[in-house]
Amino acid sequence: MPKISIILPTFNVEKYIARAIESCINQTFKDIEIIVVDDCGSDKSIDIAKEYAKKDERIKIIHNEKNLGLLRARYEGVKAANSLYIMFLDPDDYLELNACEECVRILNTEKESDFIWFDFIYKRISGVINRGNFLQDQTFTIFEYCENIIIQNKNICYWNLCSKLIKTEIYLASFSFLEKEILNTRLIMAEDALIYFFIILNCGKITTSAKNIYYYCENDNSSVGTNDIVKI
C-alpha cells in the first residue's frame, strides 16, 4: 500500500500537465501513487498522462462519465486511492521534489496528525516568485486551530485544499455531511471552502509547516486569483 496518493483533477490543462506529473514521479519519496482524474476535457491532457502511465506503474488514470467539476473530480480520485493520506495537485501547478518526503517526516514526528498544511510558493505569469512565510511549525487541536488560524489570521486563505496532506478516511467521511443534491451539483466556485470546514471538524490534530512544498502558478485560466490565495 502506498503511503501517499497525489490526486490530479484534470480538465483542459495540456500546456501544464507534463510539468505536474514530472514533479510527482520525481519525488524523493517513492512510495506514492499518482491518480489522474479525467474530467472530460477537450484537449490532449489525458493522452499526455497516458504516455506517462505507460512508463510508471504508480500512475493510475480514472475517467468520469461526464464533466463533474473540481469538487466531484477530486472526490472520485480519492475514492480510487489506496493510501492512508491524500494530497491534491492541480495540474497547472507543481510540487517541490521533496514534498512527499517532508510529509512523511512530519508524520513520523506528529503521528496523530490528520491534516498537515504547508506554506507554498506563488509563481506569477511574469516569472516572479513569492514564497509564503505565514505559517510556523506547530500542531493544534481542532479548537486551537480554529482560534489561532481561522479566527486570528483572517488574511490567509486557509480553506484552499492545495499544499495540504489529509488523512484519506477523514476526507471521505467529510462528504457524509453534504446533501446528495449538493454533491451532484456541478459547482463553479468555492468548492474547497464547501468541504474544508467539514474536513477540519473531523480532525483530531492539525499540523502546520513553514516548509514551501507547492508551486501555485498564475496563468490565464487560474480559477483562483492572487488575493484569494494569500496576501504575500
PLM region spans:
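N-proximal low-complexity "stem/linker" segments adjacent to membrane-targeting elements
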Residues: M1-I25
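Short loop->beta transition adjacent to catalytic acidic/histidine clusters or analogous donor-positioning motifs
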Residues: P2-I4, I25-V36, K44, D56-K60
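Acidic helix N-cap motif at the loop->helix transition within catalytic regions
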Residues: A18, D43-Y52, Y94, N98
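A conserved acidic beta->alpha catalytic loop
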Residues: D38-D47, K66
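Glycine-rich, basic loop-to-helix element that forms the pyrophosphate-binding segment
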Residues: N64-A81
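Short aromatic/hydrophobic "clamp" motif used to bind/position activated sugar donors
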Residues: I86
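Conserved donor NDP-sugar-binding/catalytic core segment of glycosyltransferases
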Residues: N98-F134
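Conserved nucleotide-sugar donor-binding catalytic segment
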Residues: E144-I229
